[in-house]
Regions:
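Small-residue-biased structural context
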Residues: 1-233
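Helix-turn-helix DNA-binding segment
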Residues: 230-276
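Residues within the DNA-recognition helix of helix-turn-helix
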Residues: 280-283
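Short, Lys/Arg-enriched C-terminal cap helix and immediately downstream tail that follows
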Residues: 286-288
Length: 288
């Protein structure tokens, strides 16, 4: 587990794959011997969120001490930049590698390119769907807007660890690798890159499933609670004509009761004593 006081350069020495993640978080190199916390604060990246992603992708640690500490804007920046990296750089890069390693007149080479292009289209379509639908929905939640009937769980089951097209592609390359040295070496290197990118994509999907989606679920819950609070407050105000007015704290207690909280939970939520909650409830009963 990496901590805020660990040196950033130590993380990179332990796992050079972190270099791409740094770019997606918007962290530039040249940070000397500064700690993770120092680098994140200087480059305006949320430290807790950065370490949550790093500890998950490097150490496989999916335990989140406190989902409420996650910065959803930081996660959105990371995911968007990761998509741009994969669509604009990695997919075209591997395609060029395949083109250089294959004989364009060979029928098997044409099949390999066809399978790769289908895979690339599928991945791009999925990522563009997230860009057009999921991320704007999350931004609306951040702004306190209730965005229609869409919920994050509708999207959370869409990931698969490996595309069928990519599996077929790897199988063909492995089975029918050309015998001449140059093309064999080129295609072997490309196959290695394909495996690396497949692993990267699987980790990316897991970050969405285990870190991003729980953070968005919490946003949804807060949004629903705020909506309920507003409706109840409005209802209370309308029903108080000619009666003794309820205090703001008493209104808070009513909202908490409607949400199903116990006296103890209300006390913790409002930072007051349980006896105070009971007193408020008696006053509410008298006034209403």
């Amino acid at each position: 587990m990496y901590e805020p006081d660990d040196k950033m350069i130590s993380l990179i020495r332990d796992n050079y794959n972190l270099l791409q993640s740094l770019g997606s978080f918007g962290i530039s190199l040249g940070f000397g011997d500064k700690t993770v916390k120092q680098v994140c604060e200087e480059q305006k990246v949320d430290t807790y969120t950065f370490l949550a992603v790093v500890n998950f992708t490097i150490n496989g640690n999916s335990y989140l001490e406190d989902v409420s500490k996650l910065s959803v804007p930081t996660l959105l920046q990371y995911l968007r930049a990761s998509h741009a990296y994969y669509i604009e750089f990695q997919l075209p890069f591997i395609r060029r590698e395949l083109m250089d390693a294959l004989d364009e007149n060979d029928s098997l080479a044409k099949l390999i390119m066809k399978l790769y292009d289908e895979y690339a289209r599928s991945v791009t379509t999925h990522m563009k769907y997230e860009e057009r639908n999921v991320y704007p929905y999350v931004e609306a939640l951040l702004e306190g807007k209730v965005a229609g009937s869409f919920e994050i769980d509708m999207y959370s089951k869409h990931h698969s660890q490996e595309s069928t097209k990519l599996r077929e592609l790897k199988s063909i390359i492995i089975k029918y690798l050309p015998s001449d040295g140059l093309h064999n070496n080129q295609l072997s290197a490309t196959l290695y890159d394909i495996y690396n990118n497949e692993e990267w994509l699987a980790l990316h999907a897991q970050v969405e499933d285990h870190i991003f989606i729980p953070a968005v679920r919490r946003l949804e819950q807060k949004s629903k609670q705020s909506d309920v609070t507003a409706k109840i407050s409005n209802m209370i105000s309308k029903n108080q004509e000619g009666t003794e007015a309820l205090g703001e704290r008493e209104k808070d207690v009513i909202v908490a009761l409607v949400q199903g909280m116990t006296n103890k939970e209300i006390a913790d939520h409002l930072c007051i004593a349980v006896n105070t909650v009971i007193t408020h409830r008696r006053n509410i009963a008298r006034k209403l």
